[in-house]
């Protein structure tokens, strides 16, 4: 048993920090985004579900734009380009399947940046 905040944090981009737990087949993350931070457009083979706990997060998924508020979630299919802007300070839960092996390394951003559009 472990607390998510006891996991070593990974800065994905400026203002975006994640705490990731890994199973054999999926990854769970608590992501904190500072207001104004931008997750640039990228894609990955993993299916992703983002559930917003706090704040307001504007996302573009494929060609559609969405504004997530607390309690809302979105499923991002495999290999679908997506990006986000934190309108307010945010806390979100992200899940990925299959597991994000690239997030298990000490530099999570390396694998992610390689897949950026």
Describe the residue ranges of each PLM region.
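Short beta-strand segments in beta-sandwich/barrel cores
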Residues: 28-29, 38-39, 55-60, 74
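Conserved short histidine dyad/triad with adjacent acidic residue
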Residues: 14, 29-43
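Short acidic-glycine-tyrosine-enriched beta hairpin
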Residues: 63-78
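Short strand-coil-strand connectors
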Residues: 24, 60-64
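A cytosolic small-molecule/anion-sensing beta-strand core signal
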Residues: 53-54, 69-70, 88
């Amino acid at each position: 048993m472990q607390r998510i905040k006891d996991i070593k944090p990974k800065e994905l981009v400026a203002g975006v920090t994640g705490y990731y737990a890994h199973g054999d087949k999926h990854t769970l993350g608590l992501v904190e985004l500072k207001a104004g931070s931008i997750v640039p457009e990228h894609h990955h083979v993993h299916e992703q579900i983002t559930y917003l706990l706090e704040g307001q997060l504007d996302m573009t998924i494929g060609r559609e734009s969405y504004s997530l508020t607390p309690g809302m979630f979105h499923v991002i299919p495999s290999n679908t380009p997506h990006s986000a802007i934190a309108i307010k300070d945010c806390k979100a839960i992200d899940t990925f399947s299959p597991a994000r092996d690239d997030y298990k390394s000490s530099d999570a951003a390396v694998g992610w940046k390689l897949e950026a559009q």
